[in-house]
UniProtKB/Swiss-Prot annotation:
Residues 345-359, 534-558, 570-579 have a biased composition (Polar residues). It comes from Saccharomyces cerevisiae (strain YJM789). This is Autophagy-related protein 13. The modification Phosphoserine is found at residues 344, 348, 355, 437-438, 461, 496, 535, 541, 554, 581, 646, 649. It is found in: Cytoplasm; Preautophagosomal structure. InterPro entries: ATG13 (IPR040182), Atg13_N (IPR018731), HORMA_dom_sf (IPR036570).
């Protein structure tokens, strides 16, 4: 029990030392802010920080409330205020404050206020906060607590040296020791110690009054009004907190709130230099507020001077008075018309930048051209432009007077904070003027003339627009004529549909076979020539396999070998093939064909005299005998040159196409070909240089038809490397020619 009582007494003594030393560091005239660094080492050394039996002879009697704490009573918060004492100033002195941009703000005259609060310290024993109640440690180590308090005092001493009040005191010392010029504009210049920095100790449990002084909560600079910083403090204040020290009786806390601006200046208004230097500045900054007083003073002065003159000179005096009043009135009107650059404005989040200007200033000419954003989705003016007064983009703000625009383009007007109408989605080459058809030219001319009369449009552009409208009216060829009741587009559409229906039966097989041919040989697709058409390319997706080709391939009796070797221009041959297939569509109801398979070339390609008869897609019924004979010859040549037939050549398929199904495995990186719902025309071509070589080879093969098999193999090997078919697919647009 004795040991616990001794520990408790030591803790209570540390709490008393905390309040006393903290107050001494802030209030004592021997604090670090008033002495040089060498003296500070002697006054606030390690011995002073570690000795907790310091006497309090220099502190006021009010500190006795916090000097004998027994652990049972409630200790009120201890408040220490640091202020600038103005009691020595007279009515001729003017106190001003300079902000961070160098602008001077009037604070008060010498006798209006006695104090300006600079700092407010809060020292307390917190035993009711959730932080203290949630602390789980019950026992207190006295040595550890003493070390923590020493660390707190050292941190407090460093913080005091960094606060703005210390810099203000250093300026005071320089002004006292330097040349004394009352009229100069140097900070805190006066003839003697008229101002000083003092402190006072207050009871935090009682209300703090600000009568006769400028309290800490009052902003001197008006731009700080209605604005808060990150810690929910007024913008002209800042706050620092020291980490609290835990004891069993509560948390020992120290915090400070202080002014951010500290560059005060004191000037004597009776000085001639000061009056000459600052008369124009104060007149412009206060202008409209001080004008009635100046007029009253001038009238009184004139009334006092009038008895000194004779009665005969009174008319002349009245004329001079009138002239002087007129001059003053002109000066006032000129000052009111000028933009108040030096006027102190109270900016808040809800303040409009144009609300400080008279209505005559709001009628400004803004350029009507705005940056075009064709790919931006959403409204342009969805946010109010007044949130940021420094924002230079005032295009979102509507003009004040626009009667002509509101009459014709009502939805385009936007109130502040709302979005612009739908017309902002598309940009017009005439600004806000909409385009109309020239059927009613008189009405459109009137609308354009009304819209052009907007104050936002320059005079030159108005004349240009009127000349352009007159030019449109003078040329009737430019008028847009509405379609008559005959509906010729419908006739063209019906003709196209009829042609499409006629082409459908003849191209059903071809469209399916083309899609199959695209998936047969992936190795040769890279070497195909580019098509002249604009049709979409087939999609490529993961692997899908065909079980068999279309059942129409089993119709071998009616099948014809569709091998086209066109010469010359590929587009011309493709167009002719479409014409032939269109003309002969009525006679080709029973036509069918084989899909052209990309692969190794067989010897049947060298019979040029036989194949030239089939250079068109449409084959008439008169050539059935020729087809059979050609197929028989191809079959014979295939059996003769069996070693030269490629597994995926046309001859290999033609020899076995009578089967109902031909299993062909689909490569893994090709998707199932999509058969389009529309019909496509296609033709197979080879390059012109290949046609000449193949013609020569076909002649040599006809002369040496019974030659050696090895020669045939050599020809087939060369053609396998060079004789890739080039696929041209025409566009899906139907030809208008019959």
């Amino acid at each position: 029990m004795v040991a616990e009582e001794d520990i408790e007494k030591q803790v209570l003594q540390l709490i008393d030392s905390f309040f006393l030393k903290t107050t001494l560091l802030i209030c004592s005239t021997e604090s670090s802010r008033y002495q040089s660094s060498t003296e500070n080492i002697f006054l606030f050394d390690d011995t002073w920080f570690e000795d907790h039996s310091e006497l309090v002879s220099e502190l006021p009697e009010i500190i006795s409330k916090w000097s004998h704490y027994d652990g049972r009573k409630e200790l009120p918060p201890l408040v220490v205020e640091t202020y600038l004492d103005l009691r020595q100033l007279n009515s001729s002195h003017l106190v001003r404050l300079k902000d961070h941009e160098g602008h001077l703000w009037n604070v008060c005259k010498g006798t209006k206020k006695q104090e300006i609060v600079m700092e407010r310290w809060l020292i307390e024993l917190d035993n009711s906060s959730p932080t203290f109640k949630s602390y789980s440690e019950d026992e207190t180590d006295v040595n550890e607590l003493s070390k923590q308090l020493v660390l707190l005092f050292r941190y407090l001493l460093t913080l005091i040296q960094l606060l703005p009040t210390t810099e203000l005191y250093q300026l005071l010392i320089k002004s006292y020791n330097g040349p004394q010029n009352e009229g100069s504009s140097n900070p805190i210049t006066s003839t003697g110690p008229l101002v000083s920095i003092r402190t006072c100790v207050l009871d935090g449990s009682k209300p703090i009054l600000s009568k006769g002084r400028i309290g800490l909560s009052k902003p001197i600079i008006n731009t700080y009004s209605n604005a808060l910083n990150e810690s929910n403090l007024p913008a002209h204040l800042d706050q620092k907190k020291i980490t609290p020290v835990w004891t069993k009786f509560g948390l020992l806390r120290v915090s400070v709130s202080y002014r951010r601006d500290w560059k005060f200046e004191i000037n004597n208004t009776n000085d001639e230099l000061f009056s000459a230097r600052h008369a124009s500045v104060s007149h412009n900054s206060q202008g409209p507020q001080n004008q009635p007083e100046q007029e009253g003073q001038s009238d009184q002065d004139i009334g006092k001077r009038q008895p000194q003159f004779q009665q005969q000179q009174q008319p002349q005096q009245q004329q001079q008075q009138q002239q002087q009043q007129q001059r003053q009135h002109q000066v006032q009107t000129q000052q009111q018309r000028q933009i108040p650059d030096r006027r102190s404005l109270s900016l808040s989040p809800c303040t409009r930048a144009n609300s400080f200007e008279p209505q005559s200033w709001q009628k400004k000419v803004y350029p009507i051209s705005r940056p075009v954003q064709p790919f931006k989705v959403g409204s342009i003016g969805s946010q109010s432009a007044s949130r940021n007064p420094s924002n230079s983009s005032f295009f979102n703000q509507p003009p004040v007077h626009r009667p002509s625009m509101s009459s014709n383009y009502g939805p385009q007007m936007n109130i502040e904070g709302t979005s612009v109408g739908s017309t902002s989605k598309y940009s017009s080459s005439f600004g806000n003027i909409r385009r109309h058809s020239s059927v009613k030219t008189t009405e459109n001319a009137e609308k354009v003339s009304k819209a052009v009369k907007s104050p936002l449009q320059p005079q030159e552009s108005q004349e240009d627009l009127m000349d352009f409208v007159k030019l449109l009216e003078e040329k009737p060829d430019l008028t847009i004529k509405k379609t008559s009741g005959n509906n010729p587009p419908n006739i063209n559409i019906s003709d196209s549909l009829i042609r499409y229906q006629n082409l459908k039966p003849s191209n059903d097989l071809l469209s399916e076979d083309l899609s199959v041919s695209l998936s047969m040989d992936p190795n040769h697709t890279y070497h195909r020539g580019r098509s002249d058409s604009h049709s979409p390319l087939p999609s490529i997706s993961p692997s899908m396999h065909y079980g068999s080709l279309n059942s129409r391939m089993s119709q071998g009796a009616n099948a014809s070998h569709l091998i086209a070797r066109g010469g010359g221009n590929s587009s011309t041959s493709a167009f002719n093939s479409r014409r032939n297939s269109l003309d002969k569509s009525s006679n080709k109801q029973g036509m069918s064909g084989l899909p052209p398979i990309f692969g190794g070339e067989s010897t049947s390609y060298h019979h040029d005299n036989k194949i030239q008869k089939y250079n068109q897609l449409g084959v008439e019924e008169d050539d059935d005998d020729e087809d059979d004979r050609l197929l028989n010859q191809m079959g014979n040549s295939a059996t003769k040159f069996k070693s030269s037939i490629s597994p995926r050549s046309i001859d290999s398929i033609s020899s076995s196409f009578i089967k109902s199904r031909i299993p062909i495995r689909q490569p893994y990186h090709y998707s199932q070909p999509t058969t389009a719902p529309f019909q496509a025309q296609a033709k197979f071509h080879k390059p012109a240089n290949k046609l000449i070589d193949n013609g020569n080879r076909s002649n040599s093969n006809n002369n040496n038809h019974n030659g050696n098999d090895a020669v045939g193999v050599m020809h087939n090997d060369e053609d396998d490397q060079d004789d890739d078919l080039v696929f041209f697919m025409s566009d899906m647009n139907l030809s208008k020619e019959g």
